[in-house]
Each structure stands twice: as C-alpha cells, then as structure tokens.
Swiss-Prot record:
GO terms for biological process: cell redox homeostasis; cellular stress response to acid chemical; intracellular iron ion homeostasis; iron-sulfur cluster assembly. One of its GO terms (molecular function) is 2 iron, 2 sulfur cluster binding. The keyword Chloroplast does not apply. InterPro entries: BolA, BolA-like_sf, BolA/IbaG_stress_morph_reg. This is Acid stress protein IbaG. Induction: Induced by acidic stress during exponential phase. Involved in cell resistance against acid stress. It comes from Escherichia coli (strain K12).
Length: 84
C-alpha cells in the first residue's frame, strides 16, 4: 500500500484538516490533525484513526502503523517536534 492511498482513505473517512503519512510499503507512520479529536483521550484518538484502516491491517496490506493524532491547537504547538 502506498502512503498517498492511506492519506486518501483517512481524508475520505474522517473530517481531518491534515494527514501526513510516511512509510516503506508495510510499516507506516501517520500524523492526523482534526477538530474531531478535541476532548478525546490519546487512546480514543488512535482508535478513531485505526477504524478506517482496519480492513487494510486485516488483509496485511498494512503490517504496522504508528499513529499520532492532534487537534489543530495541539498540532500548532507540537508540529516542530515532529519535523514540520
């Protein structure tokens, strides 16, 4: 699976302002930014992002995924820590 495919799946499934995906074809890192994460715990944020990806994880198109999810305010504060 390609990085842009994951980005497209997440943008279509969730109301996100930004999605950044990096990876090597089976192991991916996802940074998702959206207002929908406001008030959610870190675990709930990750579960929200995992949801649209589960079919790709189940059929091994995605072997491993690391997720960081932020509200726009959190992203404005932390984006430099993530190399943006």
């Amino acid at each position: 699976m390609e990085n842009n495919e994951i980005q497209s799946v997440l943008m279509n499934a969730l109301s996100l302002q930004e999605v950044h995906v990096s990876g090597d074809g089976s192991h991916f890192q996802v940074i998702a930014v959206g207002e929908l994460f406001d008030g959610m715990s870190r675990v709930k944020k990750q579960q929200t992002v995992y949801g649209p990806l589960m079919e790709y994880i189940a059929d091994n198109r995605i072997h491993a995924v690391s997720i960081k999810a932020y509200t726009p305010a959190e992203w404005a504060r932390d984006r430099k820590l993530n190399g943006f």
